[in-house]
From Swiss-Prot:
This is Queuine tRNA-ribosyltransferase. The gene is tgt. Residues 247-253, 271-275 are annotated as: RNA binding. The keyword Metal-binding applies. GO terms for molecular function: metal ion binding; tRNA-guanosine(34) queuine transglycosylase activity. One of its GO terms (biological process) is queuosine biosynthetic process. Its cofactor is Zn(2+). Zn(2+) binds at residues 304, 306, 309, 335. It comes from Pelotomaculum thermopropionicum (strain DSM 13744 / JCM 10971 / SI).
Amino acid sequence: MAVSFTITYKDESTGARLGLLYTPHGTVETPVFMPVGTQATVKTMTPEEVRDIGGRMILSNTYHLYLRPGHELIREAGGLHRFMHWDGPILTDSGGFQVFSLGPLRKVSEEGVAFRSHIDGSEHFFSPEKAMEVQMALGSDIAMAFDECAPYPCSREYALAATERTTRWARRCRTAHDREDQGLFGIVQGGTFKDLRERSARELVELDFPGYAIGGLSVGEPKQLMYEVLDYTVPLLPEEKPRYLMGVGSPDCLVEGVLRGIDMFDCVLPTRIARNGTALTRQGRLVVRNAEYARDFSPLEPDCDCYACRNYTRAYIRHLIKANEILGIRLTTIHNLYFIMKLMEEIRAAVRQGRMLQFRDDFLRKYQGD
C-alpha cells in the first residue's frame, strides 16, 4: 500500500493521538499541519525554507495546476515533486472545493462539473475520472476523491443530494484510480446534518480508503458548530486510519481538532493573513501594518525564534508592508508558518505527556485573551 498509518500513542482523557504517516516520500509525525502550495509553491518561500521552519508535508491544488501550467506538462517534468523541487510528501486536493466555489461559472450534473476558467474564461469539465487522471499525472503521495462541497448555510435537500453524489463519485474515483505509488483518501460530506454525516461516513468507510477527510467545514459556519460536527463525525471513522480536517488552520481550531482525534490539517490562513500584514502570536493576531507599530522596535513576537523575529522589528516589517516590498510579506509568512509548526510540535508533546486538556486551556486563555 502506498500510504499507511500507525498510531503510536492515544490520550486516555481525550480523542487526541500521535501517529506516523508513511508515504512514498517519507514518514511524517502526526498530528501534522500542511502548508498550502496552491500553485506548486508556498507563497514567497523556497522549499528549503519551508523545511527549515518545520514543514514536512505540503498541499498543492489540483484545480489551479490543471489550468496552469497543466498536468501533462508537470508529468513531463517528472511529476510535481521534481517540478517544484520538494522531496517530502505532497497531498493534492481534488479540485472539488474550487470548482464548487465558482458559483455561476459552473454547472453540475451526475457526470461531473462543467466550469469556466477563472483565468481566461475557457470551458472545462471535471469528472471523478478527470480528477483522478490529473492527480495521477501530478504524482502526489496522497490524492483526494472528487466530492461535492455543500455551502453553508444550505438546505437539507441540497446537503442530501451533495452527500449522495459524493458517495457515487467516490466509487468512480476508486475505480479510476490505479496509480500504485499514490494513496487515495475519501471525503466525508453531509453539511451540518448529523444523519447525513453518519450516512456519508458509513458509505465511504465501506469503500475502504486508506484515509478519510472531513470536508465541508470551515466554509462560514460558527466554530462551535464545526466542533459539534467533529464530535459526532470523527467517531464514525476507522480508528486505525488517518483523519484529515480539510481547510482548517487557525491556531484555536488546530488545538480543538487534535483534541477530537484529527491527524492532518491544511489551510491558507497563515500565509494569506501574512500577505495582509497580520502576524500570529500567542496573544492572538497582530496587525503589524497598523499605525501603532510604526515606532515599535520589538520583534513580531518577543519569545519567537524564527528568522523574522530574530532579526527584524515590527516597525521595519510594517515599513516594508506599507511600501509594498516583497520582503515584508516574506517575513510575516516565515513567522506565521513557524508559529504554526511550533504549535503543532507543542501539541504533539502535550499529547505525549497526557496534558492536552491543560495545554488547550492555557493556550486559549492567552490566544483568545480570556
